[in-house]
Amino acid sequence: MTYLFKHNNPLALILLAALAVIPVFQPWSLPSLSQAQDNSPVFEKLLYFLSWLNPSNGITSQLFACVLIFTESLFLNKVISDHKLMEKAGYIPALSFLLLNAITPNALMPSNIIINVILISIFKLMVVSYKQNRSYNILIVIGFLSGFVASFNTSYLLIYIWASLAILIMRPISLREWALLTVGFIMPFYFLFAGLYLTDQLKFQSIFPAIILNFSMPQLSLLKWISLGCLLILPLLSMIKAGDKLGKMVLQVRKSYLITIVLWLNCILILFLHLNGFHQRAGLLLVPSAIMFAPFFGSFKREYIPNLIIILLIIAALIR
């Protein structure tokens, strides 16, 4: 089965499209991120604007969301293929993304789709910046996109730590470049501050809502916990299994996976701050987990183990 995805086979695209539709049949009935109590007004307004995409509106909205998710998977696939972050990538990165998306709670929600495309874009710009002598414009855009995500929730300010560490890893950053990254990060908050001030609605809570810390475990069934655990366990197993092969690749590739691991750990920290709402924000892990999980499929001489994992993930997505 994985052989099909290792080559640019038209049949692989059909199978990927089928994987993208799996969330339509999910029996999940858990609160989504849009129902979290500590979202910022910016995020609430954005979700209201995209309310037509909410899967509760019917099959049309659900299928359109599936198309967007399928497009995101191909976007991530192109990033990894273009920059040769995998040997013979084929459609494996897209497969990794869609398999993990299928076991992610509320995968069709606009909140997950928005965050995913922004994180993929930031990752692409990070990789591109490696070979740029002067990447001032790229750094500002990275900072702006990171700041935009951070404006969704106060705890997402931790994204700035990842952006700073990632740039430090990817290139010999100077104080000027770090300042440009920081300026880009602050810009969304500046525009928000200016808009609220001009409309006489300026309040600190409107920009930085209080973080509702809740470290109690959510009440989920065993099957749902196993599915969510795959977002944590499978990427880690993949990095352990593929570590030797990745260690022999060029420096840009090794650094790209390193910043992905840092993002993965950063997202886990954010989820820990909202432990009771882990299932609401699990979508944060999708992009870094998919990038880390992709090398798993090329780490075995025989394909029966990767094929078994694919089958088990599809079953887990359908029977929850």
Residue ranges of predicted features:
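Transmembrane-helix signature of polytopic, membrane-embedded enzymes
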Residues: 80-99, 117
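Membrane-interface transmembrane helices that cradle and orient dolichyl/undecaprenyl
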Residues: 122-137
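Aromatic- and kink-enriched transmembrane "portal" helix at the membrane-lumen/periplasm boundary
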Residues: 95-113
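Membrane-water interface signatures at transmembrane helix termini and the short loops
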Residues: 244-301
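Juxtamembrane membrane-water interface segments that cap and precede transmembrane helices
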Residues: 40-55, 204-225, 238-242
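Transmembrane-helix motifs of polytopic, lipid-linked glycan transferases
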Residues: 67-83
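Perimembrane helix-loop-helix junctions
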Residues: 159-183
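Membrane-interface alpha helices of multi-pass inner-membrane proteins
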Residues: 138-152
